[in-house]
Amino acid sequence: MPGNLIDLEGHDLAVVPLGHTDTDNTTCLHVPSIGLVVAGDAVYNGVHLWLPESNPQKRREWITALDRIESLHPRAVIAGHKRPENDDSPKTIEETRQYIRDFDRLASATTTPRELYDKMLELHPDRLSRGALWSSARAAKS
């Protein structure tokens, strides 16, 4: 594989390093010819984000990773964590970014894990995996 490109049936698949998202050293796969990004753990679609491995600086790095994905101008984004009935719209990039911003804002404005958890549920009541949110709230307030 020369560089970060893979040829698959005449399509270039580019491995794009993203840095920290829900863990360190995340990558995504970009298929420019069809406007596709397989975002892996960088983008969530209708699911609470896994934030226990991040502090405010790491969450800023995640937002930078989302900016990088957005700069690829995808028409479809395959999220690594997804509510099955949701489509693969690129709007999930901004939804993931906004979730991180909401979490950071509320982490600063709350005092207990339960308060942070409850406030996030008020903003994001329909997301799956409330256990991930609880783990994130506990980590942010420990």
Mark where each language-model region is.
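Active-site metal-binding loops of divalent metal-dependent hydrolases
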Residues: 20, 41-42, 80-83
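Acidic, metal/cofactor-coordinating or nucleic-acid-engaging core segments within structured domains
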Residues: 29
